């Protein structure tokens, strides 16, 4: 059995699986997931070589953390065998990036996850807060938690790419260890590429999420609330239909496209069933043994060309 490739994450010394386990679906965000299924999914992912699990108290109003905690506990392996990231600042009730809330947040998360520490604690979707508060209050609070051993490393997440440079230019080097970007490294949008040299120069590890663009590049299509423009939605639909007509799965192609760039340490994919885990792992191992289906990829890229790198607004206006 091919083990999934492990990649170095910035300067952290962590080695994360090229595919990471996105645990938001365990919070029944996209439909109900039974506890037994959640536990079985985590177990299968770990068995097949996925060692990196990502969650947040926001996903499913804390349910994702609880389910992931149960799944990890059931593995009955040493804590150092897996890497866990959770987040703070975004909750079902809204956003709160204050030092006080962050302190409370990690204690609550650790209890739900049944862990003594997390490997990475991210500020979640910082474009919805004041970036200056993130720099002057939130990140220093996270540094304190790092000193106390509640998290090993600190990260920031969000959609607009300029939030990363804004914060990283204003905090001491080595303060932020990791960034998590989503929807900016996939077949339809690869704008994260432009930022990679900058992030490398800062010694910051890069995690990319949503290679399927939050459902745009799937046969079932995006959820009703998806913020993409009608143009982007219809081009994506055409790309999906093209793959289907050739008997190919766009999800596999899209995931492989994201995985092919080794500068990105891990690509997070949401998983809520054993079959999804197996499908994702097969995509990785096939990429390593057979390479990409270049012909279909070129055809899909041609269909998406008119909407390439189109994104959508996210966050509040920063003055």
Curated annotation (Swiss-Prot):
User: What keywords are annotated for this sequence in UniProt?
Assistant: Carbohydrate metabolism, Galactose metabolism, NAD, Oxidoreductase
What is reported when this gene is inactivated?
Answer: Lower leaf ascorbate concentration with accumulation of L-galactose when grown under high light conditions.
Q: Which GO terms describe its biological process?
A: galactose metabolic process; L-ascorbic acid biosynthetic process
Protein name (database record):
L-galactose dehydrogenase
Where in the numbering of this chain does the SIS domain appear?
Answer: 122-269
Q: Sorted alphabetically, which InterPro entries does this protein's record hold? A: AKR (IPR020471), LGALDH-like (IPR044479), NADP_OxRdtase_dom (IPR023210), NADP_OxRdtase_dom_sf (IPR036812)
Identify the catalytic residues. Answer: 59 (proton donor)
What CDD domains does the annotation carry? Answer: AKR_galDH (cd19163)
Look up the EC number in the record and give it. Answer: 1.1.1.316
Q: Which residues form a coiled coil?
A: none
Q: Which GO terms describe its molecular function?
A: L-galactose dehydrogenase activity
Indicate which residues the UniProt annotation says bind substrate: 124
Q: Does the keyword Cell membrane apply?
A: no
GO CC terms, sorted: cytosol
Q: Name one Pfam family in it.
A: Aldo_ket_red
Family assignment? Belongs to the aldo/keto reductase family.
Report the gene name.
Answer: LGALDH
Report the source organism: Arabidopsis thaliana
Give the first-level EC class, as a single word. Answer: oxidoreductase
- Protein purpose: Catalyzes the oxidation of L-galactose to L-galactono-1,4-lactone in the presence of NAD(+). Uses NAD(+) as a hydrogen acceptor much more efficiently than NADP(+).
Kindly state which reaction or reactions the protein catalyses. L-galactose + NAD(+) = L-galactono-1,4-lactone + NADH + H(+)
The entry's description of pH dependence is: Optimum pH is 8.5-9.
């Amino acid at each position: 059995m091919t083990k999934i490739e492990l990649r170095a994450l910035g300067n952290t010394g962590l080695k994360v699986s090229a595919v990471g386990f996105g645990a938001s679906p365990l919070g029944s965000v996209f439909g109900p997931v039974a506890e037994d299924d959640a536990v079985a999914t985590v177990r299968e992912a770990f068995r097949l070589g996925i060692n990196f699990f990502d969650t947040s108290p926001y996903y499913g109003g804390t349910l994702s953390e609880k389910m992931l905690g149960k799944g990890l506990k059931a593995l009955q392996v040493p804590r150092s065998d897996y890497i866990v990231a959770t987040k703070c600042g975004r909750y079902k009730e809204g956003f709160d990036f204050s030092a006080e809330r962050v302190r409370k947040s990690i204690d609550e998360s650790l209890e739900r996850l049944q862990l003594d520490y997390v490997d990475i604690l991210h500020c979640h979707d910082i474009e919805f807060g004041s970036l200056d508060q993130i720099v002057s209050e939130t990140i220093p609070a996270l540094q304190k938690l790092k000193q106390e051993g509640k998290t090993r490393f600190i990260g920031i997440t969000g959609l607009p790419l300029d939030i990363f440079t804004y914060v990283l230019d204003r905090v001491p080097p080595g303060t932020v260890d990791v960034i998590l970007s989503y929807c900016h490294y996939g077949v339809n949008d690869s704008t994260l590429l432009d930022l990679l040299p900058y992030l490398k120069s800062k010694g910051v590890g890069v995690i990319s999420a949503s290679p399927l663009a939050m459902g745009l590049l799937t046969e079932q299509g995006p959820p009703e609330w998806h913020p993409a423009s009608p143009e982007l939605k219809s081009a994506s639909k055409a790309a999906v239909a093209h793959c289907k007509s050739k008997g190919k799965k766009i999800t596999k192609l899209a995931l492989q496209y994201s995985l092919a760039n080794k500068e990105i340490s891990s690509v997070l994919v949401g998983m809520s069933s054993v079959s999804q885990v197996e499908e994702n792992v097969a995509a990785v191992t096939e990429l390593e043994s057979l390479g990409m289906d270049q012909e279909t990829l070129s055809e899909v890229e041609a269909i998406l060309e008119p909407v390439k790198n189109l994104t959508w607004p996210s966050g509040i206006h920063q003055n």
